[in-house]
Amino acid sequence: MCAPSVVESVRRTLSRRQFVGVVATGAAVSVPVRAQQKPIRLPKGFRDVIDLTHVLSPLLPVYPGYRPIQVRPRSTVAREGYANNEVTFDEHTGTHVDAPVHFVSGAVSADRVPVDRLLAPLVVVTIAERAAKNADTLVSADDLLQWEKRYGRIPAGAFVAMHSGWDAHVRDANRFFNRDAKGTMHAPGFSEAAARLLVTERDVSGVGVDTLSLDAASAQKFVAHLTILGAGKYGVEMLTNLSRVPPAGATIIVGAPKHEGATGGPARVLALV
């Protein structure tokens, strides 16, 4: 992105017609350059990249009390010669990171999460069949042990994700929030025992869910949050496409936000499979 001063300097050199012509033909000029680039090669042993991130838009459900993202154009190509938007959102919006400081005062903020914890072996624990029948189901410690019986011990430093299939409801806010007659939401999460096992016995880097919360949506106390974040680990909420990732063998890349003092923030999350 060119700074406004750079754009203005170009304007002074070129006539407006020339300037617009350069902009209009920019894509055509770039085609030969792209054609000369070498094809992207994945790290050895990986065959695909899966995007685990929802598109952040005003229509995406957000946790009650938070505001949907707002995007306001500040400048446009037609008017100023370059485009720029002002974006406003709560940190915990869309596919986003929960830093330890989100629940623990003085703990690590998102900008200070060690970078070697943002690249990790990905463990996917699937409870989609149970969740389809019981929205309040939890990932239990036994679910984790059963996973280990099939795939081996959860590696130290791994990122453990719950695949409940809840991301399939994201376009239907009523279904996604799943409120009962009293207004209580219902969606899966991690049990306290599972969270404790992961942070005290497996030393994971982080824990993720495809729902709005690490805890079950109906939880009155945030025990999973407190257990995970209280141990200095981070969480990622509102993941998607976990159905396309194998239970074991993939690697996750968490593009955590880095604004100073962040309690969390939208993230681009990828899986190498």
Where in this protein do the model-derived segments appear?
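Active-/binding-site microenvironments in catalytic and ligand-binding cores
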Residues: 2-273
